[in-house]
């Protein structure tokens, strides 16, 4: 009989148990060793001295590089030597305790914001910082493309003044407002009621681009600018956009390129946007506008610089009616228009409803050569404008369609005629104002005397809204002529209290009623169905010698 400890099966179990214990101990030992290595690495990391960062300038074939360290220019060794061969000027590099380059980093994203005043060659620029302090800085590699610098005069850039590098272009909201926008697709055919003015603009603007040889042969220059003046809401801005679009097409035809691919640019400048409390800031922005315009024009693109509300910026100098900031703003615009640098492919268009307040030096021939009055639409022009908004593709009420044999075009044409007849009728219901002139003569003005393209568009929009509400209420779809007539009456009633009776002479200039001075005004609107009396007359006292503030 054998002993238990000599049993082979028992020995095999003990061997297997000891092997498992050995494996567990080996695994624990490996884990302990890795933890010791990790802790040792942490100890080594904590014991390392802090790294220094520098700005890379240039590298050399021997593996050294020039860097700027805290305002000091130094030549250091790179580890490895080939690492700095791919670094670009202005880039950050990391240095070890021995002042050797051990790693290349990205560009710094913080610094001082300055404005580019002038580019010097392909790798430097003159910039203006706080307090008009001028500095010359190098351009980082991120600002230099294949064809040269990717920045231009007027751009805001981030600079590291200690290293002397411009690092990044920053798009400020102020500059974004002045960025050239592409021309909207507004054609002359989209404008109603201004055919005569459009013909005048075509002769003044398009002929020099279509027939430059004839102009040179006759010693004639293209006009530098156009002034569009007239009452509000009559299409001045719309015409300016159409001019830009037409110029782009004309230049495209002259270059034998498809007109759809021809890009024109329209820079819409609203006068109050440029006004700034800091002396010289408005003039700087005007220079920036024309610099951007010249850049695009030099590439063969036509550029329209449109000044809306022109009288707010370029008011007559020396009148004492404002803070007299125009004493320097007006000469700046004149310098840009008449300056040494030619404005080829650039045309200046100004729009104003108070052209009498614009400085005469701007309006003289040779600057704003063409002056076009945008008048209020008469009945024929109003019908043309209605045809732009009342189109056959609109849902028409079955009753109106039936009256014209189901022809949608005839139906909308008849609608336009009905509402125009209603608008331009000289009936007591359409009487608006009674004005008294300085001579004692009186004149009754009707709502038709104050119509505009914007008013006509608003009437159509009101009618469309009424048609939608009618469909939701009664389930009958379509636009009716009654909707248009009711919208016209609502538009008239809303305008009843709008005339400015405090200073009727200024109001008359803005509204387009020029002529003899108005001294007395009263509204005589008859409100239908309300039984209300006309607004009582109100005398107007015009003060004299009130000083420059009234």
From Swiss-Prot:
Keyword Phosphoprotein: no
Cellular component, GO, one term: proteasome complex
Annotated stretches, region: Docks into pockets in the proteasome alpha-ring: 549-550
InterPro entries reported for this sequence: AAA+_ATPase, AAA_ATPase_domain, ATPase_AAA_core, ATPase_AAA_CS, NA-bd_OB-fold, P-loop_NTPase, Prot_ATP_ID_OB_2nd, Prot_ATP_ID_OB_N
GO molecular function: ATP binding; ATP hydrolysis activity
Coiled coil: 9-48
GO biological process, one term: modification-dependent protein catabolic process
Region of interest: Disordered: 528-550
Highest taxon of source: Bacteria
Keywords: ATP-binding, Chaperone, Coiled coil, Nucleotide-binding, Proteasome
Residues involved in ATP binding: 233-238
Pathway: Protein degradation; proteasomal Pup-dependent pathway
PANTHER family: AAA-FAMILY ATPASE, PROTEASOME-ASSOCIATED ATPASE
Job of this protein: ATPase which is responsible for recognizing, binding, unfolding and translocation of pupylated proteins into the bacterial 20S proteasome core particle. May be essential for opening the gate of the 20S proteasome via an interaction with its C-terminus, thereby allowing substrate entry and access to the site of proteolysis. Thus, the C-termini of the proteasomal ATPase may function like a 'key in a lock' to induce gate opening and therefore regulate proteolysis.
Comment on protein domains: Consists of three main regions, an N-terminal coiled-coil domain that binds to protein Pup and functions as a docking station, an interdomain involved in ARC hexamerization, and a C-terminal ATPase domain of the AAA type.
Family recorded in the similarity comment: Belongs to the AAA ATPase family.
Known partners and oligomeric status: Homohexamer. Assembles into a hexameric ring structure that caps the 20S proteasome core. Strongly interacts with the prokaryotic ubiquitin-like protein Pup through a hydrophobic interface; the interacting region of ARC lies in its N-terminal coiled-coil domain. There is one Pup binding site per ARC hexamer ring. Upon ATP-binding, the C-terminus of ARC interacts with the alpha-rings of the proteasome core, possibly by binding to the intersubunit pockets.
Protein name in UniProt: Proteasome-associated ATPase
Organism: Jonesia denitrificans (strain ATCC 14870 / DSM 20603 / BCRC 15368 / CIP 55.134 / JCM 11481 / NBRC 15587 / NCTC 10816 / Prevot 55134) (Listeria denitrificans)
Name of encoding gene: arc
């Amino acid at each position: 009989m054998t002993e238990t400890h000599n049993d082979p099966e028992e020995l095999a179990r003990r061997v297997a148990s000891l092997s498992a214990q050995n494996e567990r101990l080996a695994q624990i030992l490996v884990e302990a060793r890795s933890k010791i290595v990790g802790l040792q690495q942490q100890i080594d990391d904590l014991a390392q001295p802090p790294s220094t960062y520098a700005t890379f300038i240039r590298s050399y074939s021997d593996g050294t590089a020039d860097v700027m360290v805290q305002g000091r220019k130094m030549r250091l060794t790179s580890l490895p030597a080939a690492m700095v061969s791919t670094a670009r000027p202005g880039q950050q590099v990391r240095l070890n305790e021995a002042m050797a380059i051990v790693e290349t980093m990205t560009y710094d994203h913080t610094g001082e914001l300055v404005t580019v005043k002038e580019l010097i060659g392909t790798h430097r620029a003159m910039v203006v910082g706080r307090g008009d302090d001028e500095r010359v800085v190098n351009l980082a590699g991120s600002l230099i493309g294949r064809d040269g610098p990717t920045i231009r005069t007027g751009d805001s850039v981030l600079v590291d003044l200690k290293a002397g590098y411009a690092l990044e272009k920053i798009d400020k909201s102020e500059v974004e407002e002045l960025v050239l926008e592409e021309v909207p697709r507004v054609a002359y055919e989209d404008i109603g009621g201004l055919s005569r003015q459009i013909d005048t603009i075509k002769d003044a603007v398009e002929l020099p681009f279509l027939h430059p040889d004839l102009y040179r042969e006759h010693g004639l220059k293209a006009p530098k600018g156009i002034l569009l003046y007239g009452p509000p809401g009559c299409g001045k801005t719309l015409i300016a956009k159409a001019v830009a679009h037409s110029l782009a097409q004309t230049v495209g035809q002259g270059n034998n390129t498809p007109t759809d691919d021809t890009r024109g640019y329209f820079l819409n400048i609203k006068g109050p946007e440029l006004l700034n409390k800091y002396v010289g800031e408005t003039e700087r922005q005007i220079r920036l506008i024309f610099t951007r315009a010249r850049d695009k024009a030099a590439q063969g693109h036509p550029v329209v610089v449109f000044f809306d509300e022109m009288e707010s910026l370029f008011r007559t100098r020396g009148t004492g009616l404002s803070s007299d900031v125009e004493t320097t703003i007006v000469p700046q615009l004149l310098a840009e228009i008449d300056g040494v640098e030619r404005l080829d492919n650039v045309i200046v268009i100004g729009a104003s409803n108070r052209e009498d307040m614009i400085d005469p030096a701007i309006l003289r021939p040779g600057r704003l050569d063409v002056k076009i009055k945008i008048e209020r639409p008469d009945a024929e022009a109003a019908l043309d404008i209605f045809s732009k908004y009342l189109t056959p593709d609109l849902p028409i009420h079955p009753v109106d369609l039936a009256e014209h044999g189901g022809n949608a075009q005839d139906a909308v044409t008849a609608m336009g005629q009905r509402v125009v007849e209603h608008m331009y009728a000289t009936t007591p219901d359409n009487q608006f104002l009674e004005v008294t002139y300085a001579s004692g003569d009186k004149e009754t003005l009707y709502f038709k005397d104050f119509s505009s393209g914007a008013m006509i568009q608003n009437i159509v929009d009101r009618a469309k809204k009424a048609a939608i509400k009618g469909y939701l209420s009664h389930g009958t779809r379509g636009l009716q002529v009654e909707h248009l007539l009711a919208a016209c009456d609502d538009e008239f009633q809303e305008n009843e209290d709008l005339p400015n009776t405090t200073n009727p002479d200024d109001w008359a200039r803005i509204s387009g009623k020029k002529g003899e001075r108005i001294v007395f005004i009263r509204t005589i609107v008859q409100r239908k169905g309300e039984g209300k009396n006309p607004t009582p007359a109100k005398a107007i006292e015009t003060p004299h010698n009130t000083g420059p503030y009234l």
